[in-house]
């Protein structure tokens, strides 16, 4: 079975596996995903008419599954430019989710998701920096997906 070939690849693989797993849980059992986030699930029978929560859970779960698969494939190809591109966007996600909680637009449970994104970005960024500084590391742009 293929495995990531670099420290930064491993950070991406772990993040990808978690994202794909949580996306799958959200598609198969949305209330279980809500509970994992520390929120109280509301059974479908008690939802108000016009409540589109399950639609948004389905959409975000599908996005998480897709993103997780992209991250896993990039990790297996050791596609470091992709790893580098994710760092600022994951930091942005952390900032947006944290801000949403601070202004009262989202429950505190979203802080965990923001922290996960922020920590993942920092760990991946540090791994990329370490790899670039070691002998023979060279520019990250040299790394291209394996054929």
Which residues does each PLM region occupy?
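Residue-level micro-sites within transmembrane alpha helices that shape
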Residues: 89, 116-118
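Membrane-helix boundary connector in multi-pass membrane proteins
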Residues: 76, 82-85, 95-113
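Cytosolic juxtamembrane helix and N-cap/initiation of the first transmembrane helix
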Residues: 1-19
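Short membrane-interface helical motifs at transmembrane helix boundaries
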Residues: 27-43
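Alpha-helical transmembrane segments and their juxtamembrane interfaces
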Residues: 74, 100, 127-130
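Membrane-water interface at the C-terminal end of transmembrane alpha helices
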Residues: 118-142, 147
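Transmembrane-helix signature of multi-pass solute transporters
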Residues: 21, 95-99, 119-123
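Core segments of alpha-helical transmembrane spans in multipass integral membrane proteins
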Residues: 17-27, 43-75, 87-95
């Amino acid at each position: 079975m293929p495995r990531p070939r670099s420290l930064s690849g491993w950070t991406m693989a772990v993040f990808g596996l978690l994202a794909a797993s949580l996306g799958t849980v959200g598609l198969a059992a949305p209330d279980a995903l809500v509970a994992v986030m520390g929120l109280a699930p509301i059974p479908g029978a008690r939802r108000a008419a016009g409540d589109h929560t399950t639609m948004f859970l389905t959409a975000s779960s599908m996005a998480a599954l897709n993103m997780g698969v992209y991250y896993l494939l990039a990790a297996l190809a050791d596609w470091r430019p992709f790893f580098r591109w994710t760092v600022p966007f994951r930091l942005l996600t952390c900032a947006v989710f944290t801000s949403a909680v601070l202004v009262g637009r989202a429950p505190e449970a979203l802080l965990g998701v923001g922290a996960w994104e922020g920590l993942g970005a920092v760990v991946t960024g540090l791994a990329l920096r370490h790899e670039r500084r070691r002998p023979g590391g060279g520019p990250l742009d040299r790394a291209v997906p394996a054929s």
